Amino acid sequence: MNTSFRIDINSHTLISNEMTTKGSCCVANFLTPQQLSELKEQVRTDAAKHNGQYFAHHGGSEIESSLLGVLGAAPEFRQLLASLYQAGAGKSAFNDEVLKVLRCVQGNSGRRESNCFHYDASLVTVLLPIEIPQNGTDRGDLIMFPNLRPVRSNVLFNVLEKALLQNALSRKLIAAAIRRHLLKPEKLQLVPGNLYLFWGYRTLHANEPCDPASRRATAIFHFGDPHAGSLATRLILKLNQRRARRATVLGTQRAV
């Protein structure tokens, strides 16, 4: 396993500036071809276990025993995350926990997980595409409204915003407005092996639908919850993890 990653400690300020001014920053060819191939093989194995339907891992042995676990524990990667949080929040993160997610959108069940606009709980979001359709219209592109809001000083404002936007009706209205060109989000066609960084807490984002015959697999690293330690934050995290487990189970059951 090749555990050397392309991280330049001198680029932290540049990355932070691009996240703020452009909405996101892309580190091209972050993974070597060998590393990308290794992760793709892991995804294929997992996809077969879930009968070609949607699944997501929130931490756990599937991630920690893989290259994703190695990356999440790499000192230079953790230093990058801490530096970005400091730049974005003006202070150090409450703790150094890195939440790692492996998400795979595939099959008919995957469409239910598209256009689910949301704000992340963490300030810093790092997206590592593993397998992404590169042709056609339904590629599962990342759509985002960058830096719509600041870091809220009160957790209740954060909860209220999430309640207003992260529900089925609001998401349908946003998706409809985009189709009618009333709203014009940024759109990123993700390239496997590149690394994408943005202010997830401040950016309303989702993925577009993915062709059921294709697979969209991404690793996501979350760092720095501005409201860490609050009861509301703990409840939101538990609800999100429960929802992900339920979506995985439903996708597998419906394929049987």
Question: Where are the predicted features?
Answer:
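N-terminal auxiliary "cap/dimerization" subdomain that precedes the catalytic jelly-roll/cupin core
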Residues: M1-Q79, S83, N194-L195, H227-V256
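Histidine-centered active-site/metal-ligand motif
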Residues: H118, H205, H222
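Short, glycine/charge-rich beta-strand/loop segments that flank catalytic centers
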Residues: H58-E64, N95-C104
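A short hydrophobic beta-strand segment most commonly corresponding to one strand
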Residues: A213-A228
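Catalytic core of non-heme Fe(II) oxygenases with the double-stranded beta-helix
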Residues: Q106-L195
